């Protein structure tokens, strides 16, 4: 009985440890996406100014 409980514990720990690296990949993708979004938001006013300058010129 003890061996069975130990085997179940071992299996559960292996399953819970397996998805961890995948979550790190998703976090990296999310961080890159956030940086791109922030860059677009910050570049928005500059693009608007360039558009107005072209319209005037």
UniProtKB/Swiss-Prot annotation:
* Record bears the keyword Transferase: no
Q: Which UniProt keywords apply?
A: Antibiotic, Antimicrobial, Immunity, Innate immunity, Secreted, Signal
Conditions for induction: Induced as part of the humoral response to a bacterial invasion. Transcripts appear within the immunized fat body.
**Signal peptide, first to last residue:** 1-21
Cystine residue pairs: none
**Pfam families linked to this entry:** Cecropin
Per the record, the GO terms for biological process are:
antibacterial humoral response; defense response to Gram-positive bacterium; innate immune response
Record-linked PROSITE patterns:
CECROPIN (PS00268)
The record ties this protein, via InterPro entries, to: Cecropin
Give the CC-aspect GO terms.
Answer: extracellular region
Compartments it resides in = Secreted
Role summary: Cecropins have lytic and antibacterial activity against several Gram-positive and Gram-negative bacteria.
Q: Its family?
A: Belongs to the cecropin family.
* The protein's name in its UniProt record: Cecropin-A
Q: Which gene encodes it?
A: CECA
